[in-house]
């Protein structure tokens, strides 16, 4: 059963809730539900260490999503590659295809191409560099 804080923290009730190590996945019937979803950050923060992703099938894309992470220091992430490594296998199985197009419906929004392999997920898309540096190991 999903935690009450999750259900109360989402303005629209999901049809299904799944969970992995990173987040609760609130699955909706339509992209419109995901796009119009409001959240209560204070309630979602109590779900730490888990964040929350809302997702649904879409007419324009294979699936859409939004990613909320108040427990980690922000309300909603613009485009989140890591969460798509969990979403893509779910939608690939459901839609019976391995190459998917996704849209993260944040205020800035972003398109992600997902290629689901046997044990890997490859993501491609456009990014904006915000930092440049060198790491020495």
Language-model regions: role of each:
Residues 1-137:
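Active-site proximal loop and beta-alpha junction motif in alpha/beta enzyme cores
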């Amino acid at each position: 059963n999903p935690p009450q804080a999750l259900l109360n923290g989402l303005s629209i009730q999901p049809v299904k809730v799944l969970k992995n190590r990173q987040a609760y996945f609130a699955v909706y019937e339509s992209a419109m539900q995901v796009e119009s979803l409001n959240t209560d950050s204070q309630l979602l923060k109590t779900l730490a260490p888990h964040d929350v992703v809302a997702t649904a099938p879409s007419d324009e894309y294979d699936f859409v999503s939004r990613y909320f992470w108040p427990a980690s220091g922000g309300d909603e992430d613009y485009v989140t590659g890591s969460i798509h490594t969990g979403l893509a296998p779910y939608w690939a199985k459901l839609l019976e295809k391995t190459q998917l197009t996704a849209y993260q419906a944040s205020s800035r929004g972003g398109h992600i191409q997902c290629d689901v392999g046997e044990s890997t997920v490859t993501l491609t898309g456009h990014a904006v560099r915000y930092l440049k540096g060198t790491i020495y190991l």
